Amino acid sequence: TQASVKELQGMGIQPDIIVCRSEHPLDNGIKDKISLFCNLPADHVLQNLDVDYLYEAPLTMEKEHLAQVVCECLHLDCPKPDLSDWETMVDNLRHPVSKVRIALVGKYVQLHDAYISVVEALKHGGIYSHTTVEIKWVDAETVTPETADEIFKDVTGILVPGGFGHRGVEGKIEAIRYARTHKIPFLGICLGMQLAIVEFARNVIGFHDAHSLELNPSTTHPVIHIMQDQIG
């Protein structure tokens, strides 16, 4: 801490607040030492302790009076925030009453961050409904009529997210067919929703070559068309 602050001061920057990441609480002696050597008030040395859940962090920083100290530095009023909704959310997260397992079927499942927005949305939905959401990552290329039973035997829902390109498309369509025929809750996002239309057209209506023009320009049943502003 002292070395990094000294480097900042060497560039003419004097920090007003220091937030210290720590696994254990900082005692007053440590805070006083940081205050002395970094040239700022002791009550501007705050601790940011490890938490079990990311969403607890704002609550812990409020306990450290971070907002109050920031407003003091900026000469602003600092009314007490109403964090009751946030506290309820964290309580739901810490005390779930049920659990679901959702199969996320994609072609980049080895790189979980590729679907981070979907993962976080599932987590948020779980928090709201007092439910732990476990994600089963499924490589779309492994899904076939022969493997589907084994892959999806233990899931309570199937999600096919957005994507592009041909690879894995038939596996996604098979996952969608399995969800429909086994009455498993399904959500298709972007390409996932388009492929749900393709699957229904093929297996229910009987348009066996139904497809998206983006993926198969020669299909005789183009149930998904490219928007005019996407045509090169």
Where are these regions (language model features)?
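N-terminal beta1-alpha1 cap of cysteine-dependent amidohydrolase-like domains
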Residues: 1-232
